[in-house]
Amino acid sequence: MTTPYPRSDERRRMVDLQIAGRGIRDPRVLAAMAEVPRHLFIPPPYDRDAYADTPLPIGNDQTISQPYIVALMTELLHPCPEDRVLEIGAGSGYQAAILARLAAKVVTIERLGAVAAQARANLAAVGAENVEVIEGDGTFGYPLSAPYDGILVTAASPEIPQPLTEQLADKGRLVVPVGGRAMQDIVVLERDGSRYREERIEGVRFVPLIGKYGWEN
């Protein structure tokens, strides 16, 4: 993903005003947000607003998160270049494309087949070759590639799904919105051997995480 994409000035303003301007400091996260073309992950006519700080529809009753939240959750995950990362809720693939620039391998799970197919196409279009898109119930995680140095959940769960904590590597981090259907808190869970430390960051509003260990459909 080294080719400069159109609308680079809009991305730079997005980063300066909406992301760095709101306290995101990790230079790798800022660089990834400035480089990945968000408009390619949003269908028309909504792509015209791709660099506004707002969630937008991507079809199938799903949304793409606002840029600030993508940057915040990525910074909280703190992926390193050698890391293996699991994302739950691929959506259109934008968050995975950001993670692909920051980690060695990204596995992203999407419940809806049509959405997963679009994510694959979008990720291929931006050359994110280190991302694998899996169709299935993300609340089970993906044991075949576990353990993960980082797990990022992009839908709201009533509680942290147990399979995800089990697939987290020692010293790994899990970032997930936890709460009711209307409002949640971003929770960061860190593993230290058999112990886990949990921190609540700030209030958010995400679509529900549907699955065995999430919400019923």
Swiss-Prot record:
Q: Which CDD domains match?
A: AdoMet_MTases (cd02440)
Q: What's in the keyword line of the UniProt record?
A: Cytoplasm, Methyltransferase, S-adenosyl-L-methionine, Transferase
Q: What is its EC number?
A: 2.1.1.77
Q: One Pfam family name from the record?
A: PCMT
Q: Which domain of life is it from?
A: Archaea
- Residues the record marks as active site: 65
Family affiliation:
Belongs to the methyltransferase superfamily. L-isoaspartyl/D-aspartyl protein methyltransferase family.
What's the protein name?
Protein-L-isoaspartate O-methyltransferase
Organism, scientific name? Methanoregula boonei (strain DSM 21154 / JCM 14090 / 6A8)
